[in-house]
């Protein structure tokens, strides 16, 4: 049986057009076009962001996308901005969800040591096809990344089913902090710095996210592989690719498996 899996940081629904708009319908169109069986989403929310005000409605992006596209879903908030705007990771799946939970990654002791900080989470869901999916978004602070890697490893070691790990890890493959993760689960790209997944628009985002880039790597090149799909040995990789789209500041990363 074939299985198409996708991870996509949706940038709070804000696209990369010349005049950016908050457009979850654009995200929906990308997902519809690619038609994955399982989708991990990061930066899902409707809070105020950059020049975009919060949506003062009952609109919940994960639920909206799931209903629009016909998927089962689970939303795992990492934080709740202003006590009313949940923000975090989401799972869309064609398979019913048997169980799901949100695991908060322990905060670093020093929350401002070398960059922007916010609490992060890991979504853990067991599907009725026998696969457990983890969806996450690591931070940019060193200790935060270390905590995240350790937390993911502990979760994976407890899981008895085949596993997928989908996420924006805010690290390139050569980052030493990632090494322990490679020892317990297989990276689809085998540690290669490709395909590049961020940013979509190099000229636009290098300036805007210079601080983030410095935390990802000391290197000065712009396009980076920071989005990942990891898998357990039961899943065989058939193909991997990204597509060009301005629906977000990240490119969707797609992997087709044989199971």
Residue spans of the language-model regions?
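Catalytic-adjacent loop/helix segments of enzymes that bind and process anionic phosphate/sulfate esters
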Residues: 99-151
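N-terminal, active-site-proximal structural segment of metallo-dependent hydrolase catalytic domains
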Residues: 1-68, 73-75, 80-85, 150, ...
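Short glycine/proline-enriched coil/turn segments at helix->beta-strand junctions
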Residues: 35-36, 69-71, 93-96, 127-131, ...
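Active-site beta-strand/loop signature of hydrolases that rely on acidic residues for catalysis
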Residues: 4-10, 27-53, 92, 132-136, ...
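Active site of divalent-metal-dependent phosphoester/diester hydrolases
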Residues: 20, 55-57, 71-93, 110, ...
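Soluble or luminal CAZymes and related metallo-dependent hydrolases
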Residues: 19-26, 57-61, 115-119, 144-151, ...
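Beta-strand-turn-beta hairpins that frame and shape the catalytic cleft
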Residues: 1-6, 85-89, 93-98, 117-135, ...
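Short, solvent-exposed loop/turn segments at secondary-structure junctions
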Residues: 10-13, 45-46, 80-81, 95-97, ...
């Amino acid at each position: 049986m074939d299985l198409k899996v996708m991870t996509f940081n949706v940038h709070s629904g804000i696209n990369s057009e010349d005049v950016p708009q908050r457009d979850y319908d654009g995200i929906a169109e990308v997902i519809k076009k690619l038609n994955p069986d399982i989708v991990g989403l990061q930066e899902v929310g409707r809070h105020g962001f950059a020049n975009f005000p919060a949506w003062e409605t009952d609109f919940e992006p994960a639920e909206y996308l799931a209903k629009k596209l016909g998927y089962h879903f689970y939303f795992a908030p990492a934080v709740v901005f202003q006590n009313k705007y949940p923000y975090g990771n989401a799972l869309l799946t064609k398979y019913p969800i048997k169980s799901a939970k949100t695991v908060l990654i322990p905060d670093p002791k020093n929350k401002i040591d070398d960059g922007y900080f916010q609490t992060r989470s890991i979504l853990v869901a067991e599907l009725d096809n026998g696969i457990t999916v983890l969806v996450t978004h690591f931070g940019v602070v060193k200790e935060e990344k270390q905590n995240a890697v350790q937390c993911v490893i502990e979760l994976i070691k407890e899981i008895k089913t085949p596993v997928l790990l989908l996420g924006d890890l805010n690290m390139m493959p050569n980052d030493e902090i990632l090494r322990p993760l490679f020892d317990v689960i297989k990276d689809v790209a085998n540690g290669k710095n490709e395909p590049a997944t961020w940013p979509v628009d190099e000229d636009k985002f290098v300036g805007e996210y210079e601080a983030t880039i410095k935390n990802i790597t000391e290197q000065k090149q712009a396009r980076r592989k920071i989005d990942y799909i990891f898998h357990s040995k039961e899943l065989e990789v058939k193909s991997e690719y990204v597509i060009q789209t301005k629906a977000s500041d990240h490119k969707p990363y797609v992997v087709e498996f044989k199971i």
